[in-house]
């Protein structure tokens, strides 16, 4: 393979070679666009749109459009794109991932493909990792788009509904992955189409694409309402977990799982008074126990989470920041609260959910950019159909990457790191020190204080100062300790006299599970041809080496008889570290693939429900759909009641009539003798005929317009109620499905099969409820739509979107008669689910 690459070049090099003629065309137009006035450049937008309307493709106008953006960029923000930046822009337009090193100007690169694709009028989303970067990038690049007559907006967390609608209606919209995803879910929960904020999802350019599409892929977006379950059992299960001894359970650090062994199971049966712990009827107890074990023996305080003011806060494993407002799902957060002795919050009920994998796959075209993507190319290709093109740097990289230094113990390693920082500080050379956890950054900070080294520590709390601190990290004599990805998206520029000292020194205190995260830390130095250096310090006590490192390496170190403060550097050690990282990356990829397998089941179901919901919202005439629904329901009911066994036929007919009376048939209007001698098809026709007559009567009773709105009101309410219950049921199924492996069933296949059966059942119940309500409807006031659930929150931040008021007529009181005509009070009928 290496010989092939030497002769023919790598895949990226060959693809860049193919792109070069387009870059040459853009370059050739440079003098021509320089001669145009600002107004003439602005008019180019209208010209391009006309050409697209006449059938030209985006690819055919690309050279001119890119040349225009390049010139306008120079005139408005003083930045002219290099040839390498144009290559990156073309790669993005082609729906691929551009790997561009830190400092190569990715924010500017996105402007040309965003402009070109915005000409279609279908909108472009530019996705960043946080609100600060979204606003900064929008404010920085807006002059370019506005000079060309395009509108550019930004979505920020605390925006109102009308502000969001305005931002999404712009040609180009900046925002974060979570805001875009939650708006999509919320749009599919609205009850009036005017409340929707997003347009159809057209083209997304994802900045820091590896962070969003890979690191965040295991965290689904969840909108939830308050659940009904008691929290007391979390405390009971926690008491059980704490009573166990080491020999009662087994921790699998590779799989991040913990399970009871035989002695632990016996103790569980005694503790919970069970005959057989493994019985399916004990599934709920098993769930509480598993989460309590995970909370106590896997989740670590100040690494995975922090406790602050009586609240458990998640710490992002990649950025080291506290994620206020976000909670672990599936009861794990409650289990940690029980472990830490703080108030156990009620478990929430999932109302809407989607993974980033499935959200971003909705876009017609997806692309991205990052400094590090190549190590995950297989995953990008497999999950998203994206290939990674490494874009050459504008200037050669002058950073020197030294081999890893390996110590026997963490104590010896940190002493060596502190000594190295001290020597670097004395020399005046700036140092950026990357740590993997809050605990480690605080340990190192204490060591530096004792040595009298002034330094900045960045961990856990994201604030706008973070970008300033990181940007200052290249100044003379500065020492900055930060989690590996802190301040991502901010360039570190070297201060006066730093080049002569060797540039910014990067010190990694531990190898991360992913090579990509290590490469990101390294990439903070050596920006745009600047000098720099990097080195990682590793100990055999580090999690990576302890869990995934080879026994052979441990044996060699033992034989060498290394002391704590002695280090080794060797190719074999470096290879062992890289192999350990590859193992973890493969493991994590498998986990994400499995999660996607599960999510694809509910994703197909979600698409069907959201499409049906959208048709209802758009005000389509549902009369024919309702008629089909009635026929389909009646056919199903008759087929399920009549088995074809002659001796049971009479009894089945009686039960069928009783069931039909419960759904819509007026009592005693159909007698047993009326249908006992009819064929199955004739029985169906008779019941369909009764239903149509009742429906025709309703059409006469109300105006046709009223009847169409009644259909929409009822269908929306029924679909929302049933879908939310179904999501919850699917969550329970997923939780329990792992036990199928003990029955020689493949869990993912069992989930797919049973999930499909549950979906069919939900569709049947939607038809049943809709027909039932429609047949009994009696209106005393104009039909009005109401949300099924009113108080909802997201799993990322407390949901503070300000809703634009929509005028409503007076709502139905809880104790009023239900407008569906059942004769019951509203709170005991349709209002039961509100």
Swiss-Prot record:
Cofactor: Zn(2+)
EC number(s) given by UniProt: 7.4.2.8
Enzyme class per UniProt: translocase
Keyword Translocase included in the entry's annotation: yes
Positions of disulphide bridges: none
GO molecular-function terms, A-Z: ATP binding; metal ion binding; protein-exporting ATPase activity
GO cellular component, one term: cytosol
Family listed: Belongs to the SecA family.
Stated name of the protein: Protein translocase subunit SecA
Native source species: Clostridium kluyveri (strain ATCC 8527 / DSM 555 / NBRC 12016 / NCIMB 10680 / K1)
């Amino acid at each position: 393979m290496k010989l092939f690459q030497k002769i023919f070049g790598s895949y990226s090099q060959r693809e860049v070679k193919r792109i070069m003629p387009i870059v040459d065309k853009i370059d050739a137009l440079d003098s021509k666009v320089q001669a145009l006035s600002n107004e003439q450049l602005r008019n180019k937008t209208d010209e391009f749109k006309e050409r697209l309307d006449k059938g030209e493709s985006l690819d055919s106008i690309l050279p001119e459009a890119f040349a225009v953006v390049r010139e306008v960029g120079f005139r408005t923000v003083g930045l002219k794109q290099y040839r390498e930046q144009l290559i990156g822009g073309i790669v993005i337009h082609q729906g691929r991932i551009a790997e561009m090193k830190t400092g190569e100007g990715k924010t500017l690169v996105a402007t040309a493909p965003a402009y070109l694709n915005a000409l279609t009028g279908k909108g472009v989303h530019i996705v960043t990792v946080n609100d600060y970067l979204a606003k900064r990038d929008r404010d920085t690049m807006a002059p370019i788009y506005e000079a060309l007559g395009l509108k550019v907006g930004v979505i920020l967390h605390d925006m109102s509904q009308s502000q969001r609608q305005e931002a999404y209606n712009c040609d180009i919209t900046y925002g974060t992955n979570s805001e875009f995803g939650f708006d999509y879910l919320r749009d599919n929960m609205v009850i009036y189409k005017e409340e929707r904020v997003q347009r159809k999802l057209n083209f997304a350019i994802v900045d820091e694409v590896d962070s969003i599409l890979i690191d965040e892929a295991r965290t689904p977006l969840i909108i939830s309402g308050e659940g009904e379950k008691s929290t007391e059992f979390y405390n009971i299960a926690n008491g059980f977990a704490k009573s166990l001894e080491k020999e009662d359970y087994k921790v699998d650090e590779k799989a991040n799982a913990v399970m009871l062994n035989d002695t632990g199971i016996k103790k569980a049966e005694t503790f919970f008074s069970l005959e057989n712990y493994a019985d399916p009827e004990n599934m709920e107890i098993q769930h509480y126990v598993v989460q309590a074990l995970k909370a106590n023996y896997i989740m670590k305080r100040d690494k995975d989470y922090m406790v602050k003011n009586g609240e458990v806060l998640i710490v992002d494993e990649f950025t080291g920041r506290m994620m206020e407002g976000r909670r672990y799902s599936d009861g794990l957060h409650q289990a940690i609260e029980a472990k830490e002795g703080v108030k156990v919050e009620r478990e929430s009920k999932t109302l809407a959910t989607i993974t980033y994998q499935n959200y971003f796959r909705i876009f017609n075209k997806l692309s991205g950019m990052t400094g590090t993507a190549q190590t995950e190319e297989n995953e990008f290709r497999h999950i998203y159909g994206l290939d990674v093109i490494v874009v050459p740097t504008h200037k050669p990289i002058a950073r020197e990457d030294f081999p890893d230094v390996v110590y026997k113990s963490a104590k010896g390693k940190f002493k060596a790191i502190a000594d190295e920082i001290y020597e670097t500080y004395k020399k005046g050379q700036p140092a950026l020190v990357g740590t993997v956890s809050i605990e480690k950054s605080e340990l190192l900070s204490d060591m530096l204080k004792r040595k009298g080294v002034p330094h900045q520590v960045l961990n856990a709390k994201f604030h706008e100062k973070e970008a300033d601190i990181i940007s200052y990290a290249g100044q003379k004599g500065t020492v900055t300790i930060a989690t590996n990805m802190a301040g991502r998206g901010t360039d570190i520029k070297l201060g006066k006299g730093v080049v002569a000292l060797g540039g910014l020194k990067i010190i990694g205190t531990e190898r991360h599970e992913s090579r990509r995260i290590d490469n990101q830390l390294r990439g903070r130095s050596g920006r745009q041809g600047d000098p720099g250096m990097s080195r990682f310090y590793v100990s055999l006590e580090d999690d990576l080496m302890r869990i995934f490192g080879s026994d052979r390496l441990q044996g060699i170190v033992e034989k060498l008889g290394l002391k704590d403060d002695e280090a080794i550097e060797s190719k074999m050690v470096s290879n062992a570290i890289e192999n350990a990282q590859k193992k973890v990356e493969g493991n994590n990829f498998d986990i994400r693939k499995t999660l996607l397998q599960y999510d694809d089941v509910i994703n197909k179901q979600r698409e069907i429900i959201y499409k049906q919901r959208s048709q209802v919202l758009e005000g389509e005439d549902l009369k024919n759909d309702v008629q089909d629904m009635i026929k389909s329901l009646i056919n199903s009911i008759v087929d399920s009641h009549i088995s074809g066994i002659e001796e049971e036929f009479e009894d089945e007919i009686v039960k069928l009539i009783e069931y039909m009376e419960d759904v819509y048939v007026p009592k005693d209007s159909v007698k047993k003798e009326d249908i006992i001698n009819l064929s199955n098809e004739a029985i169906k026709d008779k019941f369909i005929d009764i239903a149509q007559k009742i429906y025709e009567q309703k059409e006469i009773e109300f105006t046709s317009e009223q009847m169409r709105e009644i259909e929409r009101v009822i269908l929306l309410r029924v679909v929302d109620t049933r879908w939310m219950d179904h999501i919850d049921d699917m969550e329970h199924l997923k939780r329990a499905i792992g036990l199928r492996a003990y029955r020689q069933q493949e869990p993912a296949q069992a989930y797919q099969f049973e999930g499909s059966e549950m979906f069919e059942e939900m569709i049947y119940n939607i038809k049943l409820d809709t027909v039932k309500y429609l047949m009994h409807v009696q209106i005393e006031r104009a039909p009005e739509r109401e949300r099924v659930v009113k108080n909802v929150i997201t799993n990322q931040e407390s949901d503070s979107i300000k809703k634009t008021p929509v005028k409503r007529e007076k709502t139905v009181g809880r104790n009023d008669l239900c407008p569906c005509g059942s004769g019951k009070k509203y709170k005991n009928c349709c209002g039961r689910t509100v």
